[in-house]
């Protein structure tokens, strides 16, 4: 569990978010064969050491909301640049600058990140989106709909019911996209 830290000022939050977005954009443009995106959601203020270990070595981290505290984002930022959206439980002042939806390019693919997929309007595929990343349900899933990949890493925070505690990795490379759910406490996935 993270030790609570004082909330960041609004300007500092905005500066950190835009710096991470610039770093992500630079990495995407300069991407060599293979980019690994770490995907996490629903931490609810708890960043498990197993989640940190599962995300080690990724090129960028996506947090799909219900972060719980600015300290979670700060700890993840020490691993890799972050793309984050606000979840329905992210109501404190530290989360005010986080968007509800982010559409961005990473490693030559177009991502759309939203906490609750039900809040995503329209047809993502018609907008050129390759992958929709969401959270909220706490149920890890990888689903293909034609050329669109839907990825929910599940919850990496406090266990809910009998659902697994998990994160995901999205591998982007010349051979296409590959998503994997990483249950925490299970053996670490092989290196790319």
Each predicted region: which residue ranges?
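Active-site metal-binding loops of divalent metal-dependent hydrolases
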Residues: 41-45, 65-67, 88-90, 116-118, ...
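Conserved beta-sheet core of the metallophosphoesterase superfamily
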Residues: 83, 110-112, 117-180
């Amino acid at each position: 569990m993270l030790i609570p830290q004082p909330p960041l000022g609004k300007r500092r939050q905005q500066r950190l978010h835009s710096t991470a977005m610039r770093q992500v954009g630079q990495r995407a443009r300069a991407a060599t064969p293979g980019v690994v995106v770490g995907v996490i959601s629903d931490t609810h203020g708890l960043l498990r050491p197993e989640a940190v270990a599962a995300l080690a070595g990724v090129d960028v981290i996506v947090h799909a909301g219900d972060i719980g505290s600015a300290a979670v984002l700060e700890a993840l930022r020490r691993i890799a640049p972050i793309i984050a959206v606000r979840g329905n439980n992210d109501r404190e002042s530290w989360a005010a600058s986080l968007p509800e939806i982010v559409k961005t390019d990473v490693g030559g693919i177009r991502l759309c990140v939203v906490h609750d997929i039900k809040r995503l309007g329209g047809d993502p595929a018609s907008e050129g989106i390759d992958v929709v990343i969401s959270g909220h349900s706490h149920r890890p899933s990888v689903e293909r709909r034609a050329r669109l990949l839907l990825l929910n890493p599940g919850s990496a925070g406090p266990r809910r019911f009998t659902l697994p505690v998990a994160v995901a990795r999205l591998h982007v490379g010349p051979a296409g996209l590959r998503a994997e759910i990483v249950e925490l406490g299970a053996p670490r996935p092989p290196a790319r």
